[in-house]
Amino acid sequence: MNTSIKNIAAFTAGLLFVLSSCSGDFLDHKPTDAVDSGIVPVPSNAGRIFNGAWYNLFEYSSTYANIGYRALMLQDDMMADDVVSRPMYGFNSSYQFNDVVMPANNRTAFAWYLMYRTIDNCNTAISITATGDDDTPDFRYSQGQAYALRAFCYLHLAQHYQFTYLKDPAAPAVPLYTEPTVSTTKPKGKATLEELYTQIFKDLNKAKELLKGYVRPDDNSKFKPDVSVVNGLLARACLLTGQWGGAADAALEAAKGYALMTDAKTYMGFNDLS
């Protein structure tokens, strides 16, 4: 009896020690997808806001199968012609096209949450104004990257929630937000495809202007859009709107300075678990 009590006491003391010593260890004290609201308007914070917007695309939501933007890419694979759905495997609802037509489906809600939260973060970065000493190249680069990412998100939404632009530019697509939202912001109705693509081209051209001269400093920054990435997005937007000459020109600009990868370098992009 005494031994049992001693064992319980020892276990309890050990548990309390573990909890007290590491209770805060697992907390992210410097989250990459959030910024203190009190310093959001500061120009020097624009880069952190863009980083938060980007890392938001990796956020899990509602199920282990919603693994950020990668889940939406898998969803597209399932809705295309190259993948066959198997029992007991995720994305069956994508295979049946339920993910884009059923409002109550968790991936439908996830796609809107992921895209519009990222857009809202970009809107916050874009809304910051700078004058004098605050108007630095780094500030302009961060805003350019926010413009590029916002255009990328709207390209995704335009392709998923309406038929092609060439079928009907006046067709309603998705809501268009270009300003940060707050709790009292009234929901917007659907913008037309023409309105959406007008904003997309405007954002990409602005991004191209702001990112002139930007060079990624290291591999840790390769997620940040540069002018080549913006030209790639411009080529995609031109293709989707039937501007074939513009698509070719933008694609050639995007490819400048790059050579085809060797087999060895190509394999370096994959994990080797063995």
Kindly label every feature range from the protein language model.
Residues S61-G68, N92-Y95, K224, L239-S274:
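Hydrophobic-face positions in mid-chain alpha helices that act as interaction patches
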Residues M1-F11:
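Bacterial N-terminal signal peptides that target proteins for export
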Residues C22-M73, A251:
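Membrane-proximal, proline-rich intrinsically disordered regions
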Residues H160-E194, T198:
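Short coil/linker segments at helix-helix boundaries
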Residues F11-S20:
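Bacterial N-terminal signal peptides
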Residues M88-Y161, A191, E209-L211:
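Conserved, well-structured interaction surfaces
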Residues I119-C122, Y197, L204, A251:
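Inward-facing hydrophobic residues that define packing positions of alpha-helical scaffold repeats
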